[in-house]
Each structure stands twice: as C-alpha cells, then as structure tokens.
Amino acid sequence: TLYFIFGIWSGLLGTSLSLMIRTELGQPGSLLNDDQLYNVIVTAHAFVMIFFLVMPVMIGGFGNWLVPLMLGAPDMAFPRMNNMSFWLLPPSLTLLLSSAPVESGAGTGWTVYPPLSSNLAHMGPSVDLAIFSLHLAGISSIPGAINFITTIINMRWEGMMMERLPLFVWSVFITAILLLLSLPVLAGAITMLLTDRNFNTTFFDPSGGGDPILYQHLF
C-alpha cells in the first residue's frame, strides 16, 4: 500500500512535469523562455517517472501483492528487507527534487551525460544531488530484486514447478535478474562521474587519459 501511495504521489508530480513539457513543445513560441529550465524539467520528469512511479507501482506494489498470492506463499521471503527497500525511496525522491532548486538545476537529460555534467558546465551540488538520488534508488531496488528472486525460487507451493508459474511471476523474476545484472554497471558509471566531478579523477576526461565514450557504453 505504501508503494502505491508513493507511486501515485510521484505520478502526479511526474504528470505535472509532463504537462509543462507538452505545453512548451505544443506551441510555436517559447513558454518557459529558458532552455536550462526546460532541460531540468525533462531530466526530473524522466527520473521521477522511472524510479518513483513505474518501478514502485509495477514491481513494489503489484509485485509484492500478487507474487506471493500466485505462488501460494504467505508473504515475501524477507518482509523486512522489503520495508528497507521502500524507505530508501522517499529520501531518494527528496534528493532529486532538491537538485532542481539548487543553483540552476541538473538539466543534463536523463542519462546525466558527462560532458554536460562536468564541473565546468555544471558547477556546484545540483548534479551531485541528482547522482546521489540515483544511487539511493539503485540501492533500494537491489534488496527488492534479491527478495523477489528468493521468494520465487523458494516459496512456491509443493508441486508447483517453475513451468507452471503464471507469466506475471516469470516477468517479475526475469526483470529482477536483469536488474541485478545491469545495476552494478550503472552504479559504476555514476560513481566514476561523481569522482570525476569531485575528486579530480579523469575516467571520462580525454585530457587526463580517460574515455568520453566509455560512459555511453556503460549506460
């Protein structure tokens, strides 16, 4: 229920951002009169919709509710881990929203692309807040994925083979596995970006021997 409430609230927020984007694009002149502000709205809209609407509602809400029902299990394998997974999301959303009013906001597109988010183009804490927000959202989804995989493998009714599972359970299972495979790569990319910005490393800076294309590959 908490996942649904959180998802609905974030969805309303994301929809309001979406309406601003549509209004800006749906008329000949400029509505906001500020390209940077428009980019900030696009960036925030993408993050809010993916990490705080689709994932909590589809996986957190429907997943936690329907998967145990479809398996004949009394609950998820690790209910407390589920709880921990949820309570990392509100601070993550808070960090993302606080990145918008700080300085000129993180208007880098939803990938937080390095040339745009270098310390020259984006000085100060705005992009860093967006990156920390991504970290928290990622950390939140890892225990959730482990929980789903463990539940589906270990908590089926006796006699319920894997090939008899409903397709919804299979879809959650495969999604969780793919999430665990892909998240460390994304975490590595944004951690390297964070150190590039704050500790003068040159993972993505060609002048220091780094590779500017590497980030796109990782992402």
Swiss-Prot record:
Catalysed reaction equations from the record: 4 Fe(II)-[cytochrome c] + O2 + 8 H(+)(in) = 4 Fe(III)-[cytochrome c] + 2 H2O + 4 H(+)(out)
GO molecular function: cytochrome-c oxidase activity; heme binding; metal ion binding
Membrane side Mitochondrial matrix: residue ranges: 1, 61-85, 150-166
BP GO annotations: electron transport coupled proton transport; mitochondrial electron transport, cytochrome c to oxygen
Function of the protein: Component of the cytochrome c oxidase, the last enzyme in the mitochondrial electron transport chain which drives oxidative phosphorylation. The respiratory chain contains 3 multisubunit complexes succinate dehydrogenase (complex II, CII), ubiquinol-cytochrome c oxidoreductase (cytochrome b-c1 complex, complex III, CIII) and cytochrome c oxidase (complex IV, CIV), that cooperate to transfer electrons derived from NADH and succinate to molecular oxygen, creating an electrochemical gradient over the inner membrane that drives transmembrane transport and the ATP synthase.
Principal localisation: mitochondrion
Species in which this protein is naturally found: Hapalochlaena maculosa (Southern blue-ringed octopus)
Protein name: Cytochrome c oxidase subunit 1
Record's bilayer topology term: Multi-pass membrane protein
Record localization: Mitochondrion inner membrane
Pathway per the UniProt entry: Energy metabolism; oxidative phosphorylation
SUPFAM superfamilies hit by this protein: Cytochrome c oxidase subunit I-like
Residues that hold Ca(2+) according to the record: 24, 29
Enzyme class per UniProt: translocase
Mitochondrial intermembrane side: 23-39, 107-128, 188-219
Keywords from the UniProt entry: Calcium, Copper, Electron transport, Heme, Iron, Membrane, Metal-binding, Mitochondrion, Mitochondrion inner membrane, Respiratory chain, Translocase, Transmembrane, Transmembrane helix, Transport
Chain ranges passing through the membrane: 2-22, 40-60, 86-106, 129-149, 167-187
Gene name, Swiss-Prot/TrEMBL: COI
GO annotation, cellular component aspect: mitochondrial inner membrane
Pfam family, any one: COX1
Protein family (similarity comment): Belongs to the heme-copper respiratory oxidase family.
Binding positions (Fe(II)-heme a): 45
Subunit-structure text: Component of the cytochrome c oxidase (complex IV, CIV), a multisubunit enzyme composed of a catalytic core of 3 subunits and several supernumerary subunits. The complex exists as a monomer or a dimer and forms supercomplexes (SCs) in the inner mitochondrial membrane with ubiquinol-cytochrome c oxidoreductase (cytochrome b-c1 complex, complex III, CIII).
Cofactor(s) of this protein: heme; Cu cation
EC number in record: 7.1.1.9
Record note on cofactor: Binds 2 heme A groups non-covalently per subunit.
